[in-house]
Amino acid sequence: MQINITDNEISWAERILLSPGKHLSDEQKAVIRCFENKDIIACPGSGKTTALVAKLLILSRKKPLKNNRGICVFTHTNVAINEIKDHALFASQNLFNYPNYFGTIQCFIDKYLAIPAYILKFNKRLRYIDNEVFNSVIERSYNSLHSAKAWFDKRREGGLEYLQRLRFNKDNFGISLKIDGREFIGIDTPTYREINCLKLRILKWGYLCYKDAYSLAFEYLREHPGVRGFISKRFAYVFIDEMQDSSTIQVELLNKIFNDNVVIQKIGDINQSIFDYDGDLECGWTINNSRTMCIAGSKRFPSSIASKVERLCVHQQTITGNGRQTEITPMIIVYNDSTVQQVLSKYGEIIIRNNLHQNDKRIFKAIGWRGKPHDRERTIPSYWNDYSKEVKIRRTEFNNLKSYLDSQSDDSIYSQGVNFYRRRLVEAFLKCLRIVGIPENGRTFTDKKLNKYILENRPNFYKDFRINLAKWCMKIHRKEEVYEEIKNFITNEFKNIFNFDVNSELLSFINSTNSEEGNEGAICSNNIYKYSSGEDEVNIEVSTIHNVKGETHTATCYLETYFRDYDIKRILDFIIGNGNNPNGKVLIKNLKMSFVGMSRPSHLLCVAIHNDNILGREEELRNSGWDINNDLVGGMAVYN
């Protein structure tokens, strides 16, 4: 189906999505106008999601599509879905209604394949598709094993952990260590038979991990091939955002779900595929060079950074800098063993020298690949003794309202979904009820009972309550102010629903301004290095590359760390511009990590390198567009 998009329609989308005077690039407009099967390669900071949202908004005005077919939009996190909805919802309410679908690949497979397959198989509904719940069921069942337990207990990595990793095979529903691997032991052995019975029993109870849901989906498609036609008939277009984060298993399933009557556009940057996909080490995106489109222009950084980042591409990619962005020559900070812990202060000095600390929206970060301390080699803690690797900690109750409203990193929400914020908000409301002594029939309220009570006693208010929860969740993640709004809700509507008086203890809980540390299952970082020079001060957050994927910083300092060798040393030829044809898993992984890390800054890129690892190559670095700061090795800074 050919769809024509006019200049006026694009101008309309620009007015909705962009600041006054801003416009979409010609490359973005070409993507918006394209309705063919395409692999769309978008460089860091290209505005690809903005282009996708603009396209969706314009499509929503052309509905209904022929034969009332819909649009399917996949992302890899609920946060990304909410960002798209947040941009588009006020402009197009019907965009998110049937026959369209917006969500993660996992949710789609669960809803349209795994759950129907389960109902057909057992004539009842599933209880949970969740790794944590599934693993807890396995743990409770472990001691009930007989001959298999002895076999598992002998394993070096621990029997329970090994058992929790076993999956239903996607091809034959056997039991294998990987979803596409061979059986973990001979199928005629007592151990295999016992584990097969256990897995099937847990499945019958209604518990699945995410990978087993995929295997159930594969089985469903094998046994009911007509499902592919039904799903393909519903959707005219499929758009997959952040395609580089798709695993080989997800891609294989998508290929089996949609037939040739569906136009599929895959959007992303294959050079940024740094996640391990829960055991699937390979990115599932195989680019078809005959049908690629590119968004090569970055709105994030200038040409001085674009040229350095382009050299790190594993897959050849053109990256054009933003000509309106201030040009600051990227800087190499050279240090030695005795000055490694002065790198962050030198970075802070360079930030202030370039007046970046005066920017309105300033974010300064120092990042590295390896955050775990090493006995002999340098990792992130080597640069700053107070660094502690971001860890997941359990905390569900706090002594003040503000602590329940803290925003979390994208990686934390990536692992848990936006439901994390909803749980925290409900926990805050339940805390209020406990403070004023409101029980239900003498028993403490729970999340489920709270919703049930409001639904039964204030049905007209229930819908508004749910909508407000969703709205507050999105605001919290975007770091927007919600405290006053939620405070007023508790002391007015919430108080009236449960008919309680606001006592002094509740007032203390609500009004306290000291946000406590700690979050339930969240990645918590207090790794803020403070640098001062006279009256000027900058806060530098120290983090891992994985934790900053997708972010934009004012300045980024890439810290050389050790993984089988020093990462900057390993890719120095590429940094200089002499690298070509990368091969070997470690080198390719290294280049992708460095590509993600060095493509974060909008203004200033620094790279910290030990003197031993660039000795004799300073001239090459300078000639290839790097300034070199030798202050920490007793030399003079060398600038182009």
What residue ranges belong to the model's regions?
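The feature marks helicase ATPase cores and/or their adjacent C-terminal helical subdomains
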Residues: 1-640
